[in-house]
Amino acid sequence: MAQHTFLVEIGTAELPPKALRSLAEAFADNFKAELTKADLAFGDIEWFASPRRLALKVHALASEQPSKSVEKRGPAVSQAFDAEGKPTKAAEGWARGNGITVEQAERLVTDKGEWLVHTAKVEGRPAKDLLGELVASALAKLPIPKMMRWGDKTIQFVRPVFTVTLLLDGELVPAHILGIDSARTIRGHRFMGEPEFTIDNASQYPQILLEKGKVVADFMARKAKIKADAEAAAAAFGGVADLDDALLEEVTALVEWPVVLTANFEEKFLAVPAEALVHTMKGDQKYFPVYDKNGKLLPKFIFVTNIESKDPSQIISGNEKVVRPRLSDAEFFFKTDLKQTLASRLPRLETVLFQQQLGTVKAKVERIETVAGFIAERIGANVAQAKRAGLLSKCDLMTNMVGEFASTQGVMGMHYARHDGEDEVVAVALNEQYMPRFAGDALPSALEACAVALADKLDTLAGIFGIGMLPKGDKDPFALRRAAIGALRIMTEKQLDLDLVELVEEAVRVYGDKLTNKTVVTDVVDFMLGRFRAAYQDEGIGADVVLAVLARRPTRPLDFDRRVKAVSHFRSLDAALALAAANKRVSNILAKVEGELPTAVKPELLQDAAEKALATQVAELQAELAPLFAAGDYQAALTRLAALREPVDTFFNEVMVMADDEALKANRLALLNNLRNLFLQVADISLLQ
């Protein structure tokens, strides 16, 4: 069968830059699914995306769907013929509907009887007859939270659509998509190249767009060019560009013909904390800051323009003029803020509401102060410094700088605390209290900062759960999931052996009588433990491993982590699945026992060699593993327990647990109970799959 190249390009108004790549990838994924569903064979699919277009190029596309044989079953033979052997009306009607006579029908014999059947050949439809509807369906399924209407049309899309091009090799595929008829016309760059031109063949894309339209349609190629050019521009004056990937992607989505330029700002602005300057450059202007080899901010920035200018100096000058007032604002805010100490701003936190039922931010920092001291005492941190950092933790919210540049909260608190002469540990904790801010982010460095970060997160969790405002579905306005995962990461990765129950009880206690949820402690602990599942799955650890540990509900995250790592290692052993199955069998047997399970094994009642051998090993392991369990060395313990595979298998093959003799039965149940309890010291491995 012949293979073809298919192109679809949707020409639009400027697409939302932060969503551009995800829209293009979703378009490609959706179209793959549509082709597969339509049974049209295809090879590679390339996706293209620029501010004013989404496009796909499909290679090795089949000419048509394959022909299929479809079996159409008719009435049962017993119902198809009368007593004289003549076709009934039901048989004739079915045959006529399939374009055959009853005599031409085949017979199908099944265990339920004999049936008339006709095998019809259904010819596949040509690809060109299907592509329009497949493209429309793929576009309709794009993840677009907010649609737009334009002109007098009722059609909706993420942005207005101006051109639609569908080409199968050199043939224009007729289609009417998003209110536009398919045509060969595509649009070039808004200011350079040909504004509109025709494309003759799908194979010309995207080269024709580059040559005639001055558009680099390949998103990844544009991104690579911007990155390489920015790195070279910074290196030219001994600098290193801060090419944050999220900003790099956004800038890539803003331009069709990227041109990288370098500009300067006045050195006097370097007296302002770098974080504030960087916020202005990256957040407001989409510029890339530049640092020297030692990580010190330089008075330069790199930006990307969407046009080749005959006089780049004018564009550079224009961007310098744009950023200067923003940097001047930052300088003014910083100098103004320095006129007051952080501590003097504490009373003003009484005017800021944390949550209506939970009170003000001032009340929150007083709770954080208490809980941070409670935690610091348990992890060997300086209690006074942890409490001081907790009390000052939100004071920078009252500064001009944070009021204008919200993302600088925490870090500006650190700078102002240093200026005020606060202890360095306290100053750093003010910045690190929000760590980790996102998945993979760094953790607080000092123990005092860990105490404040934990106290802040636990206060939010206890408070919001305490008034019954649990996160539902994807709605989590107080970022409780992030707070829980962050707290767990701090405790496990910083090796802080803390008990969640004890921590949450303290966080609840300092709220006094504000909380109405009577089960808040259990709810918060269960919620936090539940976050482990997603966190470990991201590390490639199976859900069954986490569930096996969750079944034991260990409430010390560090201990929980050790158990998960131990069970994950155990799962890789040859004996693991057999012992998991045996534990499940033991669990089922013990579940049927009424009353309290026996634990005392009487040696004189052991009759069979298999039960004697198992009893001996279980008794030896109980003594041997006790210190390992006490030390939390669960991996070593489970590795030793793997040796029970053979005696357990032999026991079940040779011993009748539910013996008629009640004394024998009770003794064997006690043996199995002791066996199971050995494993339950770590996890419920019967849940392993």
From Swiss-Prot:
InterPro entries: DALR_anticod-bd, Gly-tRNA-synth_bsu, Gly-tRNA-synth_heterodimer. It catalyses: tRNA(Gly) + glycine + ATP = glycyl-tRNA(Gly) + AMP + diphosphate. Its EC number is 6.1.1.14. GO terms for molecular function: arginine-tRNA ligase activity; ATP binding; glycine-tRNA ligase activity. It is found in: Cytoplasm. The keyword Cytoplasm applies. The keyword Ligase applies. This is Glycine--tRNA ligase beta subunit. The lineage of its organism: Bacteria, Pseudomonadati, Pseudomonadota, Gammaproteobacteria, Aeromonadales.
